[in-house]
Structures are given as C-alpha cells and as structure tokens.
C-alpha cells in the first residue's frame, strides 16, 4: 500500500487503504459539469450537490464524474476502482474530479471522503483507492438501561454515515416489543412511526437498520410461535426494515437449546430472508456468546456451526462478556461455528458500571484479524453523545485496522464531537476512562499523563515528605487544568446533548480538582491555622461530592457519580490521609482522616459475583446486580 505525504498533510477518517497526495491544491470551481449524476447513487449525489451549493452546474467548467463501476460516466476508471464491496476510487486534479464506487455505497463513501478533503473552498490534488477491511461495521444498541431517545438515534445514524459505518443493530434490552413477553406484539402506532423514520434516515446515510428480536426467554418451539415471529418480522418489513437479527443472549431454560435455535433460524432464513430478494443476511446472537460461558463438555457452539445455514452470521463477544478480541480467541470460535465470527464488542457499554463514564481511547483489539471476522460492532453506553468518542474510533479500526492509531483517533474523535472545547473535553475524558472494580474484571488505563508523577510524589511523601518539586507542580497544574476544563465544559453550548449527559460528572470532576488543590496546600502546611482551614474545606468538599453521588444518576444498579477514580482520586485520598496523620502526630491532634472509602468487601467463590461493586445506602449494604445469568458449578441461577 502506498501512502505519501508532501507539504500538505491530509488526515482522513477512517484512514484510507491507499492515498497519494500531491503538493498542490485547487480551488473548488465556481462552474462545473456534473457527469453521471442521473445514474449514480442518489444519496451520494445529494451530498455532492450540498457540498457544491452556490456553484453552477453547466455544460462548461470543471468536469465532476460520479457513478458506480460500469456506469458510462466512470467507465474509463474501471481498473482503478477497488474490486471490494463498498470500495471506491477518488481523484482530484486540475482537470477532473472523479468519485467512482464499486457499488452504490462505495460512491457514497467517496463523497464522505471528498467532504473531508474540502476545506475553505480548496481541495488537495489526491488519488485514493479505498475499501473496508471488515464487511459489517457499526453499533449494536444492546445495553441494559435507558434506551436512546429517538432524536439521539437520528443523530447516531448520521454520524455513522459520515464515518463509513454501515450497520446499526436495534436491540435495546428495555424495549418491551423487542423482548419477552411482548415480542409477539406489533409496535403501537407512535413507536412504529418512529422506527419507520429511523429506517428512512438510515437508508439516506447508507446504514443497514438491523431490527433484532429477543424471544428466547419465553419462546415455545412450536409452529404457532414460528408464525408469530415471522408475522412480527413482516410487520417490521412493512416499516422498511431489510435486515434482521435474533438474539438468544442472557437467557436460561428451554430457550437455550441449540438444536431448536438452529431449526428456528433456518426456518426464518428459508421462509422469510431468502424469499424476499432485498433482505440482508440474518444475524444471530447465541446463548454461549463468549468463551468463558461455553460449556467445555457441551456441543452448543458446534451444533450452531454444523446446523445453521452458512449465510447466517453468529455474534461473539470474545473470551469473556467484556473482553478485547485476540487472534487466538477468534481462531477458537471460528473453528467451532465454521464461519468468521461477527464481533459484538462490549465497549464502551457501561450498564454494569453505570456510575462511571467511559470516554477513553479504543485499544486492545488485534489489528491483523480483519479477514477472520465478518463484522465488528460496538455496544455503547446509554449516553448516546458521549459514546461517539468510542464509536468514531471503532469506525476507524474496523475500516482499516492495520493503520489504526489509538491516540490520534481518540483526539480526532474529541475534536469532531466538541471542536470549540476539544482540549477541555480531552482533559475530562483522559481522567474518565476506567471502569473501577466490576464483576467482569475489565479495566482501562486512566490519567496516564500524570500517573508517573503521582506515583513518585505519593511514595516520597509517605516516606518522609521529600518529594520532588517538579512532581508537586505537575499535580498542581493538573488540578488547575481540571477545574478550568470543568467550568468551560459546563458553559459550552456547541453540543448541548453531550453537556447534558456529562454534567453530573463534570460537577464531580471540578470538586475533585478543588479537593486536590486543597490537599496539596495542606501538604505545604504553612502553619497550624492555615492547615485547619484547608482541612475543613476538604471535609466540606467531601460532603458536596457525597451529595452529588447520592442525588445524581440514581439508577437501581450502580447509582451515583464516580470520576477520576483510577489515579487522581486515590492520589488525593492517600495524600489527605497521610498529611492528616503527620499533622496529628506533630500536634497530638485527632483529626479524622477518613475519605469516602468502602468499609465492606464482597467475598465469593463465584466468578461472576466476587468482583461486583458494593454500595452503602443508609444502614444497608447493597450488591450491584449482574445483567447476565449467574452460573456456578452445574447450577444456574437468575
């Protein structure tokens, strides 16, 4: 693959497979000739005309050729167009602009790249040959908790189109008409109209709207339920849906029978999917959807592999419910299901750590396994706008994993979502990326930029106050920057849905920074009265943080608001406890050094339970419930 950069640096999302940039730009012509506009993908032509708004289409001017492989308008470029689904060829020079897709979606993606190239009425001279490495790329709305709003979903679909994602799987666990007991019933008129609008917007943005059904908890393996399921699919078909999925995840009982599941899915495939020429391949999520849950002595996965029609896609989350995808892991599952796995990546989903925001970078997935998977979709948070940071990165990874740049893509995502306060959002996101202790044992790096200074300072201070001044100043600057970022974010009006989602955490973030500043002033300890003033302020800040934690985000699972929990908060708490201890020793005092710790610990030999976080509410100690079926030994308990 050829990638040349000259004086002009061209950055594209996702990174193309082949890009040649000449050291020259041209002005977008005031007058142009559109060649092929009547034949080409109408969604692509619409985007082009919007970009050329105010320009004149005539028989003179620069030639702009647009179309799909085989069209007369781009026929002479047939050899340049990549022979891949959704591939495209794009060329810009002083004589002609060429936007040629291998298929209609490829042409649309050529326009999305063209839109990124166009800046201030100028275009770089480029030649691009591009195509996706992974066939299905997108999002599965499959989390527990508050489903996304209709407006949020509309915004998401437009975001996917811009970032060359082609799949949105609609499967919110709390939609009553998606799962038991109402999966057999049609949607009410209002909800049906909204779904119809979502399908239309998905089509305009070249996204496959995949409607998923979750019947396993109460399905009866009889003809009546088969007919009811097909009737429901037919209802969705009439609303415009052309892609379907069946989920058997997180269930127990008779619905987990792999033989019966395969029979039902093949029936759907043969009696519905294959009968209608405009329906895409059927997708299923198995009951044993990760390696740790697969019965080593059972035949669930191999039964699906042997019995399911070859065209049916099988979803997979990895070695665990929450895990990154490795070569060994995907080889293991592909051998059993006899087809490339369709990856359901459970990040940044936070339905098991709902008191945290997961705004950090996307990393950990093998970048050399594109050919081993048929799809890669991310399961997001219930916070739709905040999830776009990770979604943007997944779009880049799934399109061209070998050129995926973790940190640059993360920074670009933040700049895309909130350009007017990108530095402030980056500061906030840097310290809001870890999940904290959780039942799945999945963690993320956080506050990496200051972690070394924090560790050095804390170690030295605990050992006798001989800390390095540079480390101390680094921490001071960090807390100052956190406060500034919080204030700027709270007043930002550029992306109101985003700010509304993160506001409780931003308030907590600011209080955390203020507490950090005051604790460092206690460390400097000018005199006894000054120390006591700062001590009292810290205790007041602790109370304010407790109030936010008790009053905001009060979901029934992991209520509250946690921020900067991996490095920043432990640093502040341990420094506070240490400096109070030193003060008490020096002045024979008895100041309380308690921080907001959890005095209780969960002890269990059940893997899914032992790491579940605890909560204290008044005189009660609560265990955060698991979303999935809890298993131990040969028994299953819900």
Question: PLM features: what roles do these ranges have?
Answer:
Residues 145, 156, 174-176, 213-217, ...:
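Active-site-proximal loop/turn and secondary-structure-junction residues that shape catalytic pockets
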Residues 2, 8-94, 120-128:
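Acidic, contiguous N-terminal accessory segments
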Residues 12-15, 20-21, 28, 119, ...:
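Substrate-binding groove of N-acetylhexosamine-processing glycoside hydrolases
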Residues 232-258, 280-289:
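Active-site groove signature of glycoside hydrolases
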Residues 78-228, 232, 238-242, 273-274:
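Feature activates predominantly on carbohydrate-active enzymes
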Residues 34-40, 65-70, 100-102, 142-144, ...:
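Structural motif
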Residues 34, 103, 139, 160, ...:
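Conserved, mostly hydrophobic/aromatic
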Residues 568-571, 589-638:
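Disordered, acidic Ser/Thr/Pro-rich linker "stalks" and the adjacent N-terminal cap
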